[in-house]
Amino acid sequence: SQKSITNAVNVGTATITVEGLGTYYSGEASGTFTITPAKVEDVKVTADAKTYTGKKIKPTSFKATLNGNDVTDQFKLSAYGDNTNAGKTAGSLTIALLSGNKNFTGSTVDGTFEIKARKVASSTISVYDKYGQMVNDKYDTATVAAANLKTFTYDGKAQTFASAKLNVGNVVLETGESADTNIAKPTADDFELVYVDNVYGKSTQGATYNTAHVYAVAKEGGNYTGTKTITTADGTVIKNVVADLTFGISALKFVKENVTVKNGVYAGGVAVKPEVIVQFGGNT
C-alpha cells in the first residue's frame, strides 16, 4: 500500500513510497515521478464586483484557481482595462506569474468582473406647455391643491405635455448622496421618459379625475438603475423607475350637439332602437 508521497506539490520530481501488507508481503519500495507544468490559460480569474463611478476602476483584489484549487499567491495583478462603464463583464484585468514560477507554462491570463450600475433613489421631473413654460404648479397632483389643479380632458387620445425632462441635477443616489464630483454626473441620455395610463387614466379613490403618470426610467444596460418598480393599469411592469410626476385626466362632458340620432325603420311591431352617434373633435 502507499506509505508516503513527498515533493508532490510543485513542478519537479516527486517520490512515492509503498510498503507490503499481510503475511506474505513485507518491506517497502520507493519510486519517482515527474510533475510537469500546467498551462496558465487553464487558470480562472475572478474579482469582486465594483459599482460604477464614471472613473477607471482598479480591482483591489483577485482570485486565481486551477481546477478549483486556489493558486492566487502565484500571481500578481499586471494590468487592468478602462473599466468605466457598468456591465456584467465590463471590468477586465490581467494577472501575471510571479518571477521564477515554474508551475505553469505561459505568463499571463485575463479575466473579467462585474461593474454594477449605480442605484438612483429619487429625482424630479419638469413638464412644459407649448410655450416652453413649466407647468408643474398647475398639473402635478402631488403638489397642487385639488381646487387649483388643472387636468387634461379625456378625448380618446394619449395625453402628453408639450415636453418633459428629468432634472438630472436633482438625482439622489440610494446611499443618500447626490451625484457629485466623486461620481460621474448622470445625463439625460442615461434615462428615458415613459407615459403610463395616459389615455383613460387610472381610477383613484376620492378623486374627481383619473390619474396618469410620466415616469423617468433608467435605461436598461446603462450606468444607472432605479430602485422602484411600478405596475400599470393593464398589468405592465416597469422597472428601474427613478422619478414620477402624476397628473389628472377628467371625464369628458358632452352636450346635445355632440350626439346624433338617426331615424329608425319600422320593425314589424317591435321596439325600434335608433342608431346613436357621439362625436368629439372628429372622434366617434
Language-model segments: residues:
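Serine/threonine-rich, repeat-prone extracellular segments and beta-strand-based repeat modules
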Residues: S1-S26, N67-F113, V172-A233, I238, ...
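Short, flexible active-site-proximal loops enriched in glycine and acidic residues
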Residues: A29, A145, E220
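Non-catalytic terminal and connector segments of soluble metabolic enzymes
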Residues: S30, D110, A243-D244, S250
